[in-house]
């Protein structure tokens, strides 16, 4: 420890890890600790974190609990989905996209209460430490970051439990503990650890929390319609919904039909491969629908440019660069392409599948007069001859210069 820290804002869940961190910060840094708990749709009550923080000596005015579900979906999830974002071709970035939001509010609270440091419970082996800290430095350049997992020797659950018992930290006993490390928000739930550390092992069926097995899903497809305005989903089956309400409803529908399960070995930013399983039912449906409405409303070169940029954009989010100038620049371009992405998409949900069932838009670029296979009066097929010859010119020149 170099310069004295006066006040720390801790990203606090109320669980074992962050409760131990809270006490450890008080002991090691001898400073005031402020707790921040975010409700981003993880499905657990967040208010118990208030009582637990009080029990550990945190003043009422230093306990912050915020409902961020609408902000999360509106300002983070939806902008990401405008790009049809997938990391390494599969991952919908459910964990990655939540971290900049938490970092933003950590910094806002730090400025509000006059804190000079922030702290988080991410380990020194994962991506989250990078995401939290890059966000912190981008928004508060002089902030100090305390990452206990990189400092202490409490590197096992047994040691954490022993520390908690020694310091009177209450540990909830909820029956049999899950063998998996789980992280949830409105976009997804992730599973790591346990038998998943062996890539050859198949996940157990009772691991999945949000979805039924596709084998056990209803035998009849369910039809839905999603309405879009300027690239964002705004309603389901003609009913307007807020962003968070809409995503929650898509999660319910997708989970009912076994949609959105993913078993992935991914390349972490810190250099290692990791295996995780994800449930993203609503996001899986939303991605399919968004691509469908774009197919009607985007120009060809806009579509291809977006597809070329998407892997770079996805990596920026995965690696923690949400607040970077390059991500903002890409976002501006992506958002510009969405001004005509308005219309509706019909889907059938059936046993793990999202099946397109029609799309329509008043801004559609699909012109039957040109694309029909029947006789038309607007397209002169003879024009194609010159088009082809001009595009073939370089091949003709090269072939004559270098005959095979």
UniProtKB/Swiss-Prot annotation:
Could you list this entry's UniProt keywords, alphabetically sorted: Amino-acid biosynthesis, Arginine biosynthesis, ATP-binding, Cytoplasm, Ligase, Nucleotide-binding
Gene Ontology cellular component list:
cytoplasm
Q: Which CDD domains match?
A: ASS
Q: Which reaction does it catalyse?
A: L-citrulline + L-aspartate + ATP = 2-(N(omega)-L-arginino)succinate + AMP + diphosphate + H(+)
Whom does it interact with, and what assembly results?
Answer: Homotetramer.
Family to which the UniProt record says this protein belongs: Belongs to the argininosuccinate synthase family. Type 1 subfamily.
- The name under which this protein is listed is Argininosuccinate synthase
Species this protein is from: Wolinella succinogenes (strain ATCC 29543 / DSM 1740 / CCUG 13145 / JCM 31913 / LMG 7466 / NCTC 11488 / FDC 602W)
């Amino acid at each position: 420890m170099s310069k004295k820290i006066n006040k720390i804002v801790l990203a606090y869940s109320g669980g074992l890890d962050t409760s131990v961190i809270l006490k450890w910060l008080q002991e090691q840094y001898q400073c005031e600790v402020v707790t921040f708990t975010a409700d981003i749709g993880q499905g657990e009550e967040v208010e118990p974190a208030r009582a637990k923080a009080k029990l550990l000596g945190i003043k009422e005015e230093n306990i912050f609990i915020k409902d961020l579900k609408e902000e999360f979906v509106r300002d983070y999830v939806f902008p990401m989905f405008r790009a049809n974002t997938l990391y390494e071709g599969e991952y919908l970035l459910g964990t990655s996209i939540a971290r900049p939001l938490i970092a933003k509010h950590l910094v806002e609270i730090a400025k509000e209460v006059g804190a000079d440091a922030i702290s988080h419970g991410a380990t020194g082996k994962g991506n989250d430490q990078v995401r939290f800290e890059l966000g912190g430095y981008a928004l508060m350049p002089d902030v100090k970051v305390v990452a206990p997992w990189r400092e202490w020797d409490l590197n096992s659950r047994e040691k954490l439990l022993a520390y908690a018992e020694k310091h009177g930290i209450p540990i909830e006993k909820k029956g049999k503990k899950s063998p998996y490390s789980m992280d949830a928000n409105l976009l997804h739930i992730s599973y790591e650890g346990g038998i998943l550390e062996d890539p050859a092992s198949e996940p157990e069926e009772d691991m999945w929390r949000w979805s039924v097995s596709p084998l056990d899903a209803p035998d009849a497809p369910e039809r839905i319609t999603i309405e879009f305005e300027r690239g964002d989903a705004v309603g389901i089956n003609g009913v307007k919904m807020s962003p968070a309400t809409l995503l929650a409803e898509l999660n319910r529908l997708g989970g009912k039909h076994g949609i959105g399960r993913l078993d992935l070995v991914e390349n972490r930013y810190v250099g290692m491969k990791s295996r995780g399983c994800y449930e993203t039912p609503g996001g899986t449906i939303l991605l399919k629908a968004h691509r469908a409405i774009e197919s009607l409303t985007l120009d060809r070169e806009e579509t291809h440019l977006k597809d070329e940029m998407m892997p770079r954009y996805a990596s920026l989010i995965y690696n923690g660069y949400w607040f970077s100038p390059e991500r903002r620049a890409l976002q501006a371009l992506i958002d510009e392409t969405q001004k005509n992405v308005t219309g509706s998409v019909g889907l059938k949900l059936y046993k793990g599948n999202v099946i397109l069932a029609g799309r329509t838009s008043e801004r559609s670029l699909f012109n039957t007069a040109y694309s029909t296979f029947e006789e038309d009066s607007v397209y002169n097929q003879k024009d194609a001859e010159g088009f082809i010859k001009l595009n073939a010119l370089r091949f003709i020149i090269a072939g004559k210069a270098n005959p095979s």
